[in-house]
Amino acid sequence: MKRAAVLGVLMTLVVSGCQAPERPSTMELPAAAVDNAVAKLTGIAEDLMNSSGIPGMAVAVVHEGKTIYAKGFGVKDIREDDTLDNRVNRDTVFQVASLSKSLSASVVARRVGAGSIDWDTPLVSKLPDFALADPAVTAMVTVGDMFAHRSGLPDHAGDLLEDLGYDRGYVLSKLRELPLDGFRTSYAYTNFGLTAAAEAVAAAAGKSWEQLADDVLYEPLGMTSTSSRFTDYENRSNRAVGHLRIDNRYEPRLQRDADPQSPAGGVSSSVADLAHWLTMILAEGGSEALLPAVTPQIVSRRPTEPAMRAGFYGYGFNVGTTSAARTQLSHSGAFELGAAANFVVLPSADVGIVALTNATPSGVPETLTAEFADLVQFGEVREDWRGLYRDAFADLDAPVGSLVGKTPPTSPAPAPPLPELAGTYANDYWGPATVTERDGKLTLSLGPNAEPWPLTHWDGNVFTFGFLSENAPPGTISKASFNGDTLELEYFDAEGKGTFTR
């Protein structure tokens, strides 16, 4: 209650134009806490690089308005020789994945500060064609609701449509077909919900989101290597290539183009650039426009035992409290296809750290920033962050599907005549699925990408297919079950939408 009261007073003073009081006191930091923590960073980073085997990483720290540490480790692309040109440095550009959400919230805060929009602006006032399943929610849902993931949309709504190659407009138009949970009473992480809010902010500005981010955040802060466009990332000469983990080895396999959800996950940047942004967050976090983003707006993680602290989400920021009773702002970014990122800001210590990697997420950036935060606050690492994050990320890249790890039947029932299964099966949400028979084999294709997936007979009218995408890690297997003119696709049955008919 005391913290809430302080923030309430701060907001009142900002609105009235008075000078805000100093932050409330917290437990004193150990002597030379930040300098001592920074002195150990290189050793921590090198140890994590060696133990994880990831190809590359970059780290930066800001304190008292300055960048006091910025360094690269490892290589940008394991296919190339370990030359100076292939080594990661402070200016190497990485994809930052969902760390984009905090950057995008900063863009919105700039527009709120300019008076052109508000966190409480309803989306439909700027996007008249936008809709959700409930007309009442459609009328009320705001920019802030979407940035806090409290609209009621299902977790990661629309992400699988993106994997199939659908563009931003198509995915946003399909959100209205998804069932809603409690409006403003439930938390579910949605990339395309946040993207819809960003589109509303861009519409109010009369320009694309990508240009708006350039104009109000990246250019003013001197973030010359930062962009919300995938083509800019592709064209950087000093660029870290994403590496996918397959059989405990890292290799560049696929590139992740996140343009459809750019405000939520499509930013690319360097730690040198992100240091400018972290410095701004520390300097302007108490401003009227940014404060709502960096303070709790909804409970994102409920305690499972009395001794646990709840987790909160602001607008594009995780907001929590450390065991030293310090407010902590943070966010992670994770692409299965080869990117992992994390930043942590401790406003009361006036310090922030960011770590970027070019590999399938395994908890390395989170471990590094957590150990650094412990060193700053306590002078020592107090928790087994390596074990905690290793366990937390263990299932992140596990294959998906009910048949994963199962052995095909030794005496399966015969399949129906394959030509009888061929055809186009319609689905209002996913679009048509095409089953093609050629030379006694079936393939399935779906979505704009229309990648042909071989169908392998399993048992009777059940076939299987496997594929690799951002949400389908290596080893993923899905059932494809035929029943007359009906085709059921297990992987695409989220929200009960996996039935296709011809």
Predicted segments with their positions:
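Sec-dependent N-terminal signal peptides
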Residues: 2-11
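C-terminal motif of bacterial Sec signal peptides marking the signal peptidase cleavage site
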Residues: 14-17
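Peripheral terminal and inter-domain segments
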Residues: 19, 24, 370-502
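Short, conserved catalytic-motif segment at the N-terminal edge
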Residues: 31-94, 113-118, 133, 168-169, ...
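Short, well-ordered beta-strand elements
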Residues: 68, 341-358, 488-490
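Short, surface-exposed loop or secondary-structure junction motifs
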Residues: 76-77, 134-337, 341-343
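Short, glycine/proline-biased beta-turn/loop segments that scaffold the active-site neighborhood
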Residues: 118-134, 221
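Contiguous hydrophobic, core-forming segments of folded domains
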Residues: 347-385
